[in-house]
Amino acid sequence: MNAVIEFRNVWRHFDRQPVLRGLELAVKPGEVFALLGRNGAGKTTALRILLGFLEPHTGEASVFGVPSGALMPAERERIGYVAEGHRMYLEMRVRDALAFEAGTRPNFERAAAERELERCGIPLRKRIFFLSRGQRAQLALILAAAGAPDVLVFDDPAMGLDVVMRRELLGSLIELLSERGCAVLLSSHILTDVERIADRIGILHGGELLVDAPLDELKRRVEKRQWIPSNGAGLPELDGLLRARRVDGGYELTLLDLDPLDEARLRAKAARLSERIALDLEELFLELTTGEETHG
């Protein structure tokens, strides 16, 4: 199945500083891709390039095989977008927001949106200003989904919501995805939510995509080992070494895709090499995006 979202060698600079460095990723229909990264990693920039709000300096982002900047109105109608903060006209009533969407988006399913709003307990007559944060987030999701999109793009949709609000929003999103089967590109800081919904995870750091894989595969590929050298031996050069943290008598190593030859090098100089220590998503994320390697 062909990808409907693609980034091919995308670079973008601000003030001559690279924010994206050769970004490559693809999302197929029915797939949820979660793009993770610390603040300033380039997540929002990537989404804005995909939606045609920014141009890449090198490379290309495309949707439905069409470069983002060349998408026609009919193709844009097939894309739903929910931005961080759920920016809306706060003085509008909910029913006015529905009327606006129906007037500007030919595929907008107003009756379906009204049914979903009723299910969520959001009154049509209420001004958006007086909705809770959670209700605004649900309204933004319903408006994006009611256009029958083939692609959904979310930029931190649960930012600022409490646990209960996030759970309700995530439940709505999971239900929506099961019905639609659309391709989803999601950026988020909330790792527990990502674990529930994502088919694949990409971790962006310093504008580079460090990994791109299903969570179970990432957990297999990234590991920790305790390494105690024999007779004062130095730490060997390892292609997959992410971090080496000094501990009593040796190092705690974080390794990506440790190959048998590197493991043999470690064992040859080890008084003790522990078995692999598996990481959860939060530990994996922190190991990939914080700290520096220590050698010596």
Regions found by a protein language model. Give the residues of each.
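ABC transporter nucleotide-binding domains
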Residues: 2-7, 12-205, 209-211
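Generic alpha-helical secondary structure signal
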Residues: 18, 73, 111-115, 216, ...
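Residue-level marker of structural boundaries
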Residues: 81, 122, 224-227, 290, ...
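Short loop/turn segments at beta->alpha junctions
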Residues: 93, 214, 277-280
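Residues that form generic nucleotide/phosphate-binding pockets
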Residues: 116, 172, 221, 269, ...
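Short, surface-exposed beta-strand/loop "edge" segments at domain boundaries and coil↔beta transitions
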Residues: 152-156, 233-235, 260-263
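ABC transporter nucleotide-binding domain
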Residues: 170-258, 275
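C-terminal coupling/interaction segments
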Residues: 249-296
